[in-house]
Amino acid sequence: WCVGHLVTMSYPEKYDIKFKRWSFDTLPFLPREFKYEVIPGVQKQFEIVKGLLNREDVDTIYVCTDSGREGEYIYRLVAQMAGVHGKKEKRVWIDSQTEEEIMRGIREAKDLSAYDNLSASAYLRAKEDYLMGINFSRVLTLRYGNSVSNYLNTKYQAISVGRVMTCVLGW
């Protein structure tokens, strides 16, 4: 089972070591294809899930991640990284954790392909968050990092920009 996210998008230096150093010369960072990797702290759990998904005696996988875009994204990334092929995949969509609701969800499980648009929207949202965060954090840090650190009388640090962070904190 997944315990939250097991897979994440790779940092720019995984594409090319030149991106490890923050510089205006390497911006904007816009990869043609996105790279993913297992989150180091959950590698053991990923290997367990990968082993279960790829068991030869399993022909149907019931996807029971949270019912929503993020749950869909979590499973699709794990299946992608685990190399799941040739299995029937059914999506269990439930609104509560009662036994009755869980049984209904299993009985009425749809082919995973019925949720392809939801999956596509999740991948798109993740790519947008990634590109905005990587590029704007680097631009603002390179341009204003020293000024902000001097003003706050703190050690130089990155200025983080993100979709959720920016609106929640009012930045």
Q: Residues of each region from the PLM?
A:
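Prokaryote-biased recognition of long, low-complexity C-terminal linker/tail segments
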Residues: 129-171
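Intrinsically disordered, low-complexity regulatory segments
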Residues: 1-138, 167-170
